[in-house]
């Protein structure tokens, strides 16, 4: 049993070559995430499932932010997402704002907000207010 070489092991020109991203049904690159985990000195060893899970989490977060930013762009009657739409999407969502609270988005602007003390006071009926002032 010396092994023929051609019959065992991996085929050199494999027809079913499939990326780990497509196996997992992801758009984000699992191989690149794995390489970055290894090169980043986060740990001595990186398991096979870790980059798949991390790529799936990153893809989910990106999809969530882009969906909310697309809604913000549509509300402003725009067809292109700009940093302002990303800022509005993140700051108006409670969980994303908590996650990205200390992140500054360039050209994002600020949320429109007027403090209650600066707003004009509402007066219901003028007759009652004038009698109460005396």
Swiss-Prot record:
PROSITE patterns: HISTONE_H2A. This is Histone H2A. GO terms for cellular component: nucleosome; nucleus. Pfam families: Histone (PF00125), Histone_H2A_C (PF16211). The record marks 121 as: Not ubiquitinated. Core component of nucleosome. Nucleosomes wrap and compact DNA into chromatin, limiting DNA accessibility to the cellular machineries which require DNA as a template. Histones thereby play a central role in transcription regulation, DNA repair, DNA replication and chromosomal stability. DNA accessibility is regulated via a complex set of post-translational modifications of histones, also called histone code, and nucleosome remodeling. SUPFAM superfamilies: Histone-fold (SSF47113). It comes from the Eukaryota. CDD domains: HFD_H2A (cd00074). The nucleosome is a histone octamer containing two molecules each of H2A, H2B, H3 and H4 assembled in one H3-H4 heterotetramer and two H2A-H2B heterodimers. The octamer wraps approximately 147 bp of DNA. The modification N5-methylglutamine is found at residue 107. It comes from Gibberella zeae (strain ATCC MYA-4620 / CBS 123657 / FGSC 9075 / NRRL 31084 / PH-1). It is found in: Nucleus; Chromosome. One of its GO terms (molecular function) is DNA binding. The modification N6-acetyllysine is found at residues 6, 10. Residues 1-11 have a biased composition (Gly residues). Belongs to the histone H2A family. Residues 1-24 are annotated as: Disordered. Keywords: Acetylation, Chromosome, DNA-binding, Methylation, Nucleosome core, Nucleus. Acetylated by ESA1 to form H2AK4ac and H2AK7ac. In contrast to vertebrates and insects, its C-terminus is not monoubiquitinated. InterPro entries: Histone-fold (IPR009072), Histone_H2A (IPR002119), Histone_H2A/H2B/H3 (IPR007125), Histone_H2A_C (IPR032454), Histone_H2A_CS (IPR032458). Its main location: nucleus. Disulfide bonds: none annotated.
């Amino acid at each position: 049993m010396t092994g023929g070489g051609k019959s065992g092991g991996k085929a050199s020109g494999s027809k079913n070559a499939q990326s780990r991203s497509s196996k997992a049904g992801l758009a984000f690159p699992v191989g690149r995430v794995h390489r970055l985990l290894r090169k980043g000195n986060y740990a001595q060893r990186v398991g096979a499932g870790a980059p798949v899970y991390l790529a799936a989490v990153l893809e989910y977060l990106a999809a969530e932010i882009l969906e909310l930013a697309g809604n913000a762009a549509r509300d402003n009657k725009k067809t292109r997402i700009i940093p302002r739409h990303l800022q509005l999407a993140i700051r108006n969502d409670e969980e994303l704002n908590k996650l990205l609270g200390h992140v500054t988005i360039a050209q994002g602007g600020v949320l429109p907000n007027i403090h209650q003390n600066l707003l004009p006071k509402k007066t219901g009926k003028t007759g009652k207010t004038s009698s109460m002032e005396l």
